[in-house]
Regions:
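Substrate-binding/active-site clefts of carbohydrate-active enzymes
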Residues: 91-101, 110-291, 557, 573
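Soluble or luminal CAZymes and related metallo-dependent hydrolases
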Residues: 129-133, 179-182, 241-246, 291-299, ...
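Short, flexible loop/turn elements at secondary-structure junctions
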Residues: 6, 28, 39, 110-115, ...
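Generic recognition of well-ordered alpha-helical segments
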Residues: 135, 185-188, 248, 302, ...
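Short, contiguous acidic/charged loop-to-helix segments that flank catalytic cores in large enzymes
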Residues: 170, 174-178, 237, 288-292, ...
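Conserved alpha/beta catalytic core and glycan-binding cleft of carbohydrate-active enzymes
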Residues: 258-260, 275-442, 470-527, 531-542, ...
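Carbohydrate-interacting/catalytic domains
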Residues: 1-105, 130-141, 145, 406-408, ...
């Protein structure tokens, strides 16, 4: 069955009929064509042969195919979806029933380059399979203390260099890594290891390859316009059939593959009619004379309502970089209905600050504090994503000023700042061991760097920090309100120090965080505390086993009746260089 209105005929050609058309029957005036081909079986290749009213004939892959031929082949492949035995019932039940806050520390992964075969039989296919990744990536991420995996698009795509963001198969896990059952096994194993799986999903545009959705019936059908920035087609959100196609795709991944959420790519490009159009003469406007794409807005609300209705416990995340209001607001109140939004402002400000050399940081202190001026206007995730380590932007390590030691110290401090700042967390693969080069999608990560002590110690540091975050409710229970965050000193620009308190539901188990962005050491730094008694240092980024200089605070810190930071009591600590406690 396929939707292909305003054509003369639709036939099915495939390996089961020697690529000779078997014509489908039109279903009234719906534009839908259907038929049954008894000899077709799982694994067979097929396409649609479409003839337009103008007499043009061409072949297309099935928009609704569950599997595809391995690239560079472009045919669809018949898949067997039933028959997989799931073992994630307990995880699924907890996800559906849990309403209380949970930690969110996401490991973002490109499956094709996380790790590759050392000696592949075919150099064009060096990838690990879904099942191999289930045995290697999944336990690694769980052992590292992450709570979720987020996968760059696994939907079928023809070009490796698109990283999966130019899709042809919105219902097909890419055949580069195996069959649909293999991907089910990957998700199943993730759940059995306690990891959620979030899928990057691209409803804003699709690639122009001839076998894909573009000009599917000889003219614009799924698309409404060209995408000027990305060389792709934009979906026509005004068509109910297109909205239904996309929402069905999202629900399919959540139901059939047990995914725990979708991260909607390029939301900003969907919300604005003229996104990426520099020429005023080419711009278009809606009926109210503004640039908002009202059809896309309605689609996003329908999408989020559908996900929350049909996939209880699943989340939706928006990559949205403008100031569009209420992205995570309820649809009934005029919001878009997402559960989370990437905080692109935090990411940009933080990375700009981190690459600033130490003598000049005091003049840019606001880049560290501005995020809290709007920090609870949405439910945010703090992303250090793949987009920040490509196209000449440098790796995170490459941004850090100073010598080798200071670079690692800066990277440790960045990780602590991210994990103690309100909001969910997302880090791209490899940042846990500190590579110096940017990410390259065509080759494996540089795992050999773990043979070097500095990189190995950094990986161990991230593991311990992740576990501290996961096991400390004060760092995530009240992540989206002022109840969980209190500035002790936001204005110490002279010393480039941030001082704040994180609080969960047990107020007496609050955590005080000090972050020093300068290479200076302070031996007697006083911090205000809310209660008398004894305090201890939970974690120190400067600890020797992590590659630090060992400026720690061992033993008991006894509160003294000396007022400080608006509190009646205070403790005196040693502050490490380019470090946090």
């Amino acid at each position: 069955t396929v939707w292909c209105p305003e054509v003369t005929s639709v036939g099915v050609i495939g390996s089961f009929n020697d690529w000779t058309p078997v014509y489908l029957t039109p279903q009234g005036s719906t534009g839908v064509y259907s038929g049954v081909i008894p000899e077709a079986k799982p694994g067979d290749l097929y396409k649609y042969r479409i003839t337009t009213a103008a007499g043009e004939t061409f072949d297309k892959a099935d928009p609704y195919a569950f599997w595809a031929e391995v690239r560079p082949g472009t045919a669809s492949r018949i898949a067997q979806l039933d028959g997989y035995s799931w073992h994630d019932g307990r995880y699924q039940a907890v996800r559906r029933s849990t309403k209380s806050p949970r930690p969110m520390n996401i490991y973002e992964v490109h499956l094709g380059s996380w790790k590759q075969q050392e000696q592949p039989e075919d150099p064009d296919y060096p990838f690990l399979s879904y099942r191999q990744l289930a045995e290697e990536l999944v336990p690694y991420a769980a052992e590292m203390g992450y709570t979720h995996l987020e996968l760059l698009p696994v939907m079928e795509h023809p070009f490796d260099g698109s990283w999966g963001y130019q899709v042809t198969g919105f219902f097909a896990p890419t055949s580069r890594y195996g069959a649909p059952h293999d991907f089910m096994y990957f998700v199943d194993q993730a759940h059995q290891h306690g990891l959620g799986v979030i899928l990057d999903w691209v409803p804003g545009h699709f690639c122009r390859d001839a076998h894909g959705l573009g000009r599917f019936n000889g003219k614009m059908l799924f698309e409404g316009a060209d995408h000027p920035e990305w060389g792709t087609y934009k979906f026509d959100f005004a068509r109910s059939e297109v909205r239904g196609f996309l929402i069905s795709s999202a629900l399919y991944w959540l139901s059939c593959f047990h995914a725990d959420g979708i991260r909607v790519d390029g939301v900003t490009s969907m919300l604005y009619l003229n996104f990426g159009l520099p020429d005023w003469a080419e711009k278009t406007y809606n009926a109210q004379g503004s640039e908002e794409n009202t059809a896309a807005v309605e689609f996003l609300r329908q999408l989020n309502d559908a996900v929350h209705a049909y996939a209880p416990g699943a989340i939706t995340v928006a990559e949205e970089s403008s100031a569009w209001p209420h992205v995570t607001g309820d649809t009934a109140s005029g919001g878009l209905g997402f559960d989370y939004k990437w905080d692109m402002g935090w990411m940009n400000d933080t990375l700009e600050y981190c690459k600033t050399d130490f003598p000049f940081r005091s003049y840019h202190h606001n880049q560290l504090t501005f995020s809290m001026a709007y920090g609870f206007s949405e439910r945010f995730i703090l992303p250090l994503s793949h987009d920040e380590v490509v196209h000449g932007k440098l790796s995170l390590m490459g941004r850090m000023p100073g010598d080798y030691w200071r670079k690692f110290a800066g990277l440790r401090l960045l990780a602590m700042y991210q994990l103690t700042h309100p909001g969910g967390k997302l880090s791209f693969m490899s940042t846990e061991y500190g590579p110096f080069i940017e990410w390259r999608e065509y080759e494996s990560l540089e795992w050999f760097l773990l043979d070097y002590p500095a990189h190995r110690m950094h990986r161990d540091y991230v593991q311990h920090l992740n576990r501290l975050y996961r096991d400390t409710p004060a760092l995530w229970q009240d992540d989206h309100s002022w109840e969980g965050f209190h500035w002790l000193d936001a204005d110490d620009s002279a010393q480039s120090i941030l001082l704040f308190r994180r609080t969960g539901r047990e107020k007496t188990k609050a955590v005080t965080v000090l972050l020093n962005f300068q290479p200076n050491v302070y031996s007697d730094f006083r911090i205000g505390v809310p209660y008398p008694g004894q305090y201890r240092e939970l974690f120190n980024s400067d600890a020797g086993p992590f590659g630090g200089s060992g400026k720690e605070n061992p033993g008991i810190l006894k509160a003294e009746p000396i007022p400080c930071h608006g509190e009646k009591w205070s403790v005196c600590v040693r502050v490490p260089p380019i470090g946090g406690i």
